[in-house]
Amino acid sequence: MSDVQSNVKPLTLTTGRVIFAIAGVYVTQSLVSALSMQSLPALVRAAGGSLALAGATTLFMLPWALKFIWAPWIERWRLPPGSQERRSRMLILRGQVALAAMLTIAAAIGWFGREGGFPDTQIVALFVLFMVAGTVASTIDIASDGFCVDQLTRTGYGWGNSVQVGGSYLGMMCGGGVFLMLSAASGWPVAMLMMAVLIMALSLPLWRITEPTRTATIPHVPALGYALRRKQARLGLLLVLMLNSGMRFVLPLLAPLLLDHGLSMSALGALFSGGNIAAGIAGTLAGGLLMKYTSPGRALLTAYGVQGIALLAVVMTLMMAPGHLLLQILQCLVIVQSISLACALVCLYATLMSLSSPLQAGVDFTLFQCTDAAIAILAGVIGGVVAQHFGYAACFLFAGAFTLLAAWVAYIRLHSARELMTSAID
């Protein structure tokens, strides 16, 4: 009997099938975030809601920053201890259906609220609904990241993260600009219903595949403590802290920088909705190529090196560019920043996948993401205060110099820790 079993080839998925299956899921997650944090404020204000209520949409970030708390429980359900079973596909698809159902409910709330002028109770109902949707989407993300780490080889991590970052740009476009255009043409309840249908369509590729089981029964119980005890996880947290702090410090300042130097609001919208998305997709492809043809250390050094140089170029432009060319150069540099940001994120998160334990990939990768989210919140607040007191040039000078130093330190650290990159379990 054992001879027969040894000749049975275990089910595996090719890189192409994994990427095709999971791409729509990553689009969905960003779509829901864009609906919550971009489109919902516009709907609230258009319906007569207060600016304070519109500003409260930043609370939808909370599930994404706090999902590390419930990640171990999700991972234990996804990878049952003592079993060869994997439940990523089942968990993700159920979550996708739940998201589509919640958007359908949101459409119904909007439809029945038309006659009454959209009272506050229905606005509050939408807020509660989208908070739940954000929690579901962030939970799906735990399972989908674990699925990618499980099914992709190390050489495929770059392409997997290209799809992840590229999918986020497409999702933001669908949940933001496309949704608002559909709302203007057909009313937002109809647009919301169309988004629900889109989510179901994006789920079909994953529904059509069969998730391979694990090759052996593993008794490991996923836990945050295990992650923090691993050298690989601590290295990953260090990389996130070093490499992303600089750009997160100035990222919220890009739009105010352009507005303060004369760019109109409509032109800013066109730049951020069209140019930034195209640049971001180009950056994801560049990141995938870097990870395919270079080592993680060299890829990070290149991507974050370009990012640091672009940040310092903003300082040089503010100090030396002629007045009639200043705005045009700044717009070009913002596009370069978008390319370098997407490229850097692909390289960083592909490296973090390599540092995630296959015993609990969802927990480890979620810990990295939540650290990045916390850095984004903290660095963004500090950057705004520094810009208020010392000006844009000081902020971009610090961010550029810090990013270049971090890129070099990360390269040295990864070069001296190559054994950690080839040993996910210790």
Language-model region placement:
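C-terminal ends and interior cores of transmembrane alpha-helices
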Residues: L93-P119, V306-G323
